[in-house]
């Protein structure tokens, strides 16, 4: 009896670890999001060549977040980060109407990869503070998210610079990754 209570206690209160891959087209705001979550402040960023990785502690969960560069020349490298990924954060610049089709194509190409078949998908519709930003419903439509019948997905409106929506996204991720575990 004591052993089962101990197991229950540790399951409830032990720190959980989750591996998250954050990708998206260049200049979508991935690195700004990562460091807003990690440091709580806005950092000056330059285009990511390669990756940034940080551990973000939130609600007794340790998220290891891999922020991988999004320039078209280095997108083929994304697949090297797929293994053991539990959650995928796809960041979209909601103000970039010219490249939303490109974002959709990259997202669907990635979701067809076998190594990501069990990963849940969180889309951050970023840069919602800009006046011409597409809202979450429009991004959902443009990215073809409703066609993802076999995948847990969610879209969250965000503003990386203010932090708005970021923790709501992490809440959804933690609840949905935990329910699949």
UniProtKB/Swiss-Prot annotation:
Name the Enzyme Commission number(s) assigned to this protein. Answer: 3.6.5.2
Provide the catalytic activity annotation.
GTP + H2O = GDP + phosphate + H(+)
Could you tell me which InterPro entries the record lists for this protein? Arf1-5-like, P-loop_NTPase, Small_GTP-bd, Small_GTPase_ARF, Small_GTPase_ARF/SAR
What Pfam families does the record point to? Arf
According to the UniProt entry, where is the signal peptide? none
One biological process term in Gene Ontology? protein transport
Q: Which domain of life is it from?
A: Eukaryota
The UniProt keywords, alphabetically, are: Auxin signaling pathway, Endosome, ER-Golgi transport, Golgi apparatus, GTP-binding, Hydrolase, Lipoprotein, Myristate, Nucleotide-binding, Protein transport, Transport
SMART domains for this protein? ARF (SM00177), RAB (SM00175), SAR (SM00178)
Which residues are listed for GTP binding in this entry? 24-31, 67-71, 126-129
Q: Describe activity control.
A: Activated by AGD7 and AGD10.
Compartments reported by the entry: Golgi apparatus; Endosome; Golgi apparatus, trans-Golgi network; Early endosome
Which molecular-function annotations from GO does this UniProt entry contain? GTP binding; GTPase activity; mRNA binding; phospholipase activator activity
Report one GO cellular component: Golgi apparatus
Lipidation, kind N-myristoyl glycine: residue numbers? 2
Q: Does the keyword Transit peptide apply?
A: no
What PANTHER family has UniProt attached to this entry? ADP RIBOSYLATION FACTOR-RELATED (PTHR11711)
- What does the sequence similarity comment in the record state about its family? Belongs to the small GTPase superfamily. Arf family.
Role this protein plays: GTP-binding protein involved in protein trafficking; required for the sequence-specific vacuolar sorting route to the lytic vacuole, for the ER-to-Golgi transport and for the Golgi-derived transport to the plasma membrane. Involved in the recruitment of COPI and GDAP1 to membranes. Required for recycling of PIN auxin transporters (e.g. PIN1 and PIN2) in a fungal toxin brefeldin A (BFA)-dependent manner. Involved in various auxin-dependent developmental processes.
On assembly, the entry states: Interacts with AGD7 and GDAP1. GDP-locked form interacts with cytosolic tail of p24 proteins. Interacts with AGD5 at trans-Golgi network. Interacts with A.tumefaciens AK6b.
NCBIfam families in alphabetical order: small_GTP
Q: What is this protein called?
A: ADP-ribosylation factor 1
